[in-house]
Design a protein with these regions (language model features):
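Positively charged n-region of N-terminal signal peptides that target proteins for export
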Residues: 1-4
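Bacterial N-terminal signal peptides
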Residues: 7-17
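Extracellular/periplasmic carbohydrate-active domains that bind, remodel
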Residues: 19-142
């Protein structure tokens, strides 16, 4: 019985996606986290390096607001938002180049996206703010 339990534990462990323990702080890649500087280049560099080095966790620090345009998520990357961290979509619509609907620009523009990638996580206790307008849903508070 003990052997069976150990065997099942091994199988479950092997079935989980493998995420490296390497940690990449976006501030180390030049992110300001002040809510007005475009941090997309720094965030993308952190994601690229993390994936190229075998994967790990890209951390957005607590108490900071990271303004960002489109980000391509890559294999083996866990995008982790500390409690109190905010990932804020850049409101400048001109910077969004890819549409989920192909050539139909203006609809379904991609902010956080991946292509031919695997083992991606977006998690943590922070906030992802798509910077959308209130519109019809503004009347329904959280």
């Amino acid at each position: 019985m003990r052997r069976l339990i150990l065997l099942l534990a091994d199988i479950l462990f092997l079935a989980l996606p493998a995420f490296s323990q390497a940690t990449y702080q976006v501030m180390d890649f030049g992110a300001k986290g002040d809510g007005s500087t475009d941090d997309a280049p720094a965030l993308q560099r952190a994601i690229d390096v993390c994936s190229a080095e075998g994967g790990g966790r890209v951390v957005l620090s607590h108490g900071k607001t990271f303004l960002s345009g489109p980000l391509q998520l890559k294999s083996g990357v866990e995008l982790y938002l500390d409690a109190g961290a905010v990932l804020l979509a850049n409101p400048d619509e001109r910077i969004y180049r890819l549409s989920a609907f192909g050539s139909n620009r203006g609809e379904g523009m991609l902010w956080l996206w991946a292509k031919d990638a695997h083992d991606i996580r977006v998690c943590g206790r922070g906030t992802i703010d798509g910077n959308g307008y209130g519109g019809a849903f503004a009347q329904y508070p959280r």
